[in-house]
Amino acid sequence: MAKIIGIDLGTTNSCVAVMEGDKPKVIENSEGHRTTPSIVAFTDDNEILVGQSAKRQSVTNPEKTLFAIKRLIGRRFDDPIVQKDIKMVPYKIMKADNGDAWVRVKDQDKAPPQISAEVLRKMKKTAEDYLGEEVKEAVITVPAYFNDSQRQATKDAGRIAGLEVKRIINEPTAAALAYGMDKKRGDSVIAVYDLGGGTFDISIIEIAEVDGEHQFEVLATNGDTFLGGEDFDLALIEYLASEFKKDTGIDLHNDPLALQRLKEAAEKAKIELSSAQQTDVNLPYITADASGPKHLNIKLTRAKLESLVEKLVERTIEPCKTALKDAGLTVSQINEVILVGGQTRMPLVQKTVEEFFGKEPRKDVNPDEAVAVGAAIQAAVLSGEVKDILLLDVTPLSLGIETMGGVMTKLIEKNTTIPTKATQVFSTADDNQTAVTVHVLQGEREQASANKSLGRFDLRDIPPAPRGVPQIEVTFDIDANGILNVSAKDKATGKAQSIVIKASSGLSEEEVAAMVKDAQSHAEEDKKFKEMAELRNQADSLIHSCEKSMKDLADELSEDEKKGIETAISELKEAVQGTDKARIEDKLKVLTDASAKMAERIYAKKSSEGQTAQGQTQSQESTKPAEEGVVDAEFEEVKEEDKK
């Protein structure tokens, strides 16, 4: 049976894992790393680079190197948070026709799910190379606080990458699975504090033994989908840029190349300061003006970095308080605290978490890999490989509809266990009203307009009647992925209307299908590109070995042999310069055959010479006098008592 893989699609890094027997295995990518940078680059010769190779060239190709795309997924261009990011990234974020935030690369507009799909394809390929078989299904993780639009967009990314997304699960829940899989100590309540590259989540999860099953029940979740390591980097970039401007009067924000170098240096300094007390940020030739080149050299202490990001760390505490309140628990009732996400390696974060929860967080969970491991465990549960685990997740935000006076009426409260279904009867607001618009909302505010609009649809042909008489039954149905279906039915006529919520933004079926097709054509191009590269390498290797053999064996070859091989080499060299695969293969075969004949003849010659020489040696040895090689020696007898 084909494996279902688990993918942690992160803002900064991504990771893929699979269950092998009863143990999850994190798979190394082609570069030998267990995590892959979530970076996609488009080169001038139309190659798409993903991961480490994209990151390596980011400084020389800043406007076509896309990072932290997960921060844009499922978001509107006019969102203040997106507007803030526009000023801080070297690539171009633009407004799509549907109002979403997209990116522009090489005069082409691309949706965030398209870019994320490239990262997912890399994860898929990593798993396929390891497993030796095609992978078609995956469990993909998302921040617990992702709304419906963001979950839909992540599912779309999976489809574009050629994966059937069997389940979308929340990152903290996945981390809890990874932690609790082999813990059999009875019931416990854990807090998963997940501060990743772009998002923050806190989940309170109860792990219990119920009828022999390991049950993971999410009691409450909260968070901030625009708070993470990238914001810590941005705070440091702002500080470095402002210090440089003070010294030189030059604003580095206007220079994409300088900004990209600054980003790399900030990230490196931040990581170094998790173990060191101070570091130097040294960027020679960062920019230039009329007076000549300018260099950036700033000494940075851990204390300074902590003062820059203190408010960001403090922002994580309020969601922790809310999650505990929603779970009906106090800090003292939390048995263990687990840290997930690379940013939790920062000493200030660890100290803040320890102070809030009153206990030291556990150190036996790998913050970079736990989420992918949990996704792989859930994948094995879905495929039937693992049978004694039950996962009960929740919807992070309340869901409802807009009712009279612009009020949001909630049908499903936040932190309700999913899957779930809720039905409520509404009526008309005016006499003889023949249609109602069902406006679906997600959020916690009483005012409808202050919440996230997930979509709207009309229920028509309601028989005319005084206001308040018609009975309109509205049903909300959330599946295990946290994705919503809404239906409305006129109880008098039985007329019904339903939609799977596709946000008023988001990608249409046609757009997703077109992107799937585009990704497939790219996959075909990539395959051809790889085949040609391998063929050229094979040809170069053969040319080199033939030229070396001809040089070493010049005296052994006839003029005809030399000429034949030289011609074959020359024709193969010419073919390699072109793009005709069949011609390269043909010329490769000609040279292979010619070199094989040369090798065969020389081997036969050497072999016969060797046999002749061996025969002569044997005959010489047989004529040697028998005494030769015999040596006279004196020896002394050792008596038994002398041995002791």
UniProtKB/Swiss-Prot annotation:
List the Gene Ontology MF annotations in alphabetical order: ATP binding; ATP-dependent protein folding chaperone; unfolded protein binding
Residue spans of biased composition, Acidic residues class: 629-644
Annotated region Disordered: the residues are 602-644
Renumbered to this chain, the Polar residues biased-composition regions fall at 609-623
Question: Does the keyword section mention Glycosyltransferase?
Answer: no
Pfam family name, one: HSP70
Which family does the similarity line name?
Belongs to the heat shock protein 70 family.
Protein name according to UniProt: Chaperone protein DnaK
Q: Which organism is it from?
A: Legionella pneumophila (strain Lens)
